[in-house]
Amino acid sequence: MGGRRAEALAAGVALAAFANALRGDFVFDDFRCGPGGGPREETKPRPPPGPGLTGPDGRLRLRRAVVENPDVVKATPLADLFRNDFWGTPLASPVSHQSYRPLAVLAFRAVFRLGGLRPEPFHAAVWAAYAVSCALFVRVCRRVVFADPAPGRLLLCGLLFALHPVHCEAVASVVGGAEVFASVFFFLSVLASPAAAGVGGLARCCAYAVVAMLFKEQGIMALPVGAAVRLLRAAAGGRRAEVVAGVKYAAAAAAVFLAVLACRVGLARHFPTWTRHENPAAFAPDGLRAWNHLYIYLFNLRLLILPATLSCDWGMGSIPLISRASEPRALASALALLLAAAVAALSLAAVCGRRPEGRRGKGKENLGCVLLAGVCFAVLPFLPSMNLLVVVGFAVAERVLFLPSAGLCIIAGTLLHRLAGRAPRHAKLPLVTFLLALLAARTVARNRAWRSAESLFGAAIAAAPRNEKVYAMLGDKHMKDGALDRAEGLFKAALALEPGDFKMHYSLGVLYQQRGALDASLAAFRGALATGPEFSATINGRVFAAHLHNKIGDVQSRMGRPDAALESFDAAVAAAAGDAAQAAELVLGHANRGAVLGGLGRWGKSAGAHEAAYKVAGAHGLHGRALEALFAAIEALVAAGRHAAARERIEAVLRADPRNARSRALEGRLLRLADG
């Protein structure tokens, strides 16, 4: 079987195995289903555009995903895609996630323009890109990794990659498409590296790598992967000229890599602040943190080797922390590290110490070179997720294993092909077919889990029953659908796992508010405010605290307790003052104060509160809320009998918008009052 046929077969198998992913909905990070809703301009005071409150993962989410991302679904300037993060928030914003993937957003935007806001076109785009990625992976194996591209081994590696169940999160979710798109250009960069000579060849490799990075940050690792594999092949070949050329290429690629990395770091205005809820291992005690990180690396390797148990989220209590260095998990992690180091050392010795490949004859490829190449593909793209330089916002994320899985498939395919060569002829095909059938069955089943929010979160609960976040996700979905009893049970189950989780108190407060159980809602919101000291130190937490004061005041106002409500709104204003990240909460706090003061007949103070809301909203570009606050101030001035001041503000609105119907109506009302 030729290389082109192996590429086509791998792509075809990938399309067949992931065909049922085309019927999936928008789920998980594709959209938010939490009670907070998404940022939007409103005509009445509502929860602010900043927080996003409890998203599908039960966390405070200060970002938008595909469905709510204005850079995808609105006609924002194309330049905004290069100024905003992946979720549509400006990089300069203190609440930006700092994930910079403008080409992924551009791809989603193109799909939206062509197919509308339906999940099918988005899934189809990712599905097609996955087939291309699988074909390119086979080509990388044929042209870059293997000196002797035996057709059977080539096809086996390609099918292992095409059928790997850990790819489901990247292929079956729309947001995960960033990984798939990036992999296409990652493989193109690696493909170009062996022949790269001179400025033009280096520029081509670097261009592909930069494009990959603009789809997903890990894409830039194509440069070190390509350089490392080229050096390995040169060392195994034993030709001095190739080694010298490889060293020169590696040095040039390293310089470009560092320059691009410096530019990317320069784009980051700040690093996001995470908590133990997102990445528990990063907050383990100092003496145990390294052990926990080492175990997390081993856990990721287990997902690649044995992808039987998969989950859309591995945060919180999914992976219990190592509490003693003498724990079996810690010892197993250390043993695995030593074993990996020994295998790498032996492979390196095989590359450097054995007869060059060119003198061995056909089929006598340097096994150590192939194994080390697989290690490079597995480890280097995983480095950004290893918490080495900065803390990342997750413990384990299956989608970031997409590129590292290529290395595992190279190693596994090579070893399995060698073992099959020693097996009886009548047993080879059945054994390999059985393994591939197992992978295909797991992949098809996992795609079904990604079809809807209910099936996805239900599978996550089965896989990680101690992760309170997945209970919160499913509870949020049920609350959105109006199944409040189911949602309440899930939120309480989450609280049983993590009693101090302020997010669950908040979600229960929203649920009780929807039911009209105001006493229970007030108690839940107060519980949320009292249980979040750890989170309150972050930007997100400060916004959330201000929002909670506003929510508490809203409930108190509905309960007929205006004085208590005013105290809560004052607390919201105090918590939000002077912080650009909390401008929307500050506007809401002033507007709510104005509404309560108006209800008490204190119209002068009510007008002052609404005018304060107007000034803050105007200063921060919240134009819809600014206009609403101005009209509320005018109404209060009219009620206070300050007609001249009211007319002055109406005339200012009419000068800016002569056709404003509401201003005309207020002007007519003033005239009638004057005639009376």
Q: Where are the regions a protein language model picked out?
A:
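Polytopic membrane enzymes that build or remodel cell-surface glycoconjugates and lipids
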Residues: 1-519, 526-533, 544-546, 551, ...
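Conserved structural position within tetratricopeptide repeats
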Residues: 462, 493-496, 529-530, 537, ...
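Helix-start (N-cap) detector for alpha-helical repeat units in TPR-like alpha-solenoids
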Residues: 468-469, 502-503, 536, 546, ...
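TPR/Sel1-like alpha-solenoid repeat signature
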Residues: 471-478, 490, 504-515, 524, ...
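Terminal, low-structured helical/coil segments at or just beyond the last alpha-helical repeat
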Residues: 645-676
